[in-house]
Amino acid sequence: MEVIYEDNHIIAVDKTCREIVQGDKTGDKPLSEMLKAWLKEKYCKPGNVFVGVTHRLDRPVSGVVIFAKTSKALSRLNEMFRVGEVRKTYWAIVKNRPQQDEGELVDWLVRNEKQNKSYAYDTERPNAKRAILRYKLIAHSDNYYLLEIDLKTGRHHQIRCQLAKMGCPIKGDLKYGFDRSNKDGGISLHARSAEFIHPVSKENVRIVAPVPDDNLWKALSVDQ
């Protein structure tokens, strides 16, 4: 666990693809509990430590995750994420070049709970939620393409699903059509940055997570 930002109200970590944000059926220790122990030790606190979850990242995804250190920050950040006042930028490595190097994707997503998978459609249908993102090709190698994604809505598996529908499955994402897994078990989707107005100080905050320690990531991001 790597802490990449901290103030009196907020703490952010660079999540690896092996870590989970909140507890799940695996029983693995979540980042929220790791942070409580980290804060308790750092500040020598004898009692309980408050750490609130403000948003989530899928387990196989890496990058910025923001937690609240106070209840005031938690309630305000939860609302900011809900109404889209946190600008989230992702980087994704995909196997195919998009037909256009820059564009907007607008789809209707239907979530299948049993499969833990979402399906994208061109038109509205029952139980579908509108999903919007903008993407831009920012680098490429002989075999892979690095896309920067500005996420406008936060739907279940949205980026993974929409990029796959576009014909550009994310490297390592077997669930959405890539042909083989990554060695670390994750997928090549990275929450690169989060930018927002601080819920208490009202100053502009931008938190950036370094790319994963991987040769392909480093090669593609060297000029970014």
Give, region by region, the residue ranges found by the protein language model.
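RNA pseudouridine synthases
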Residues: 1-224
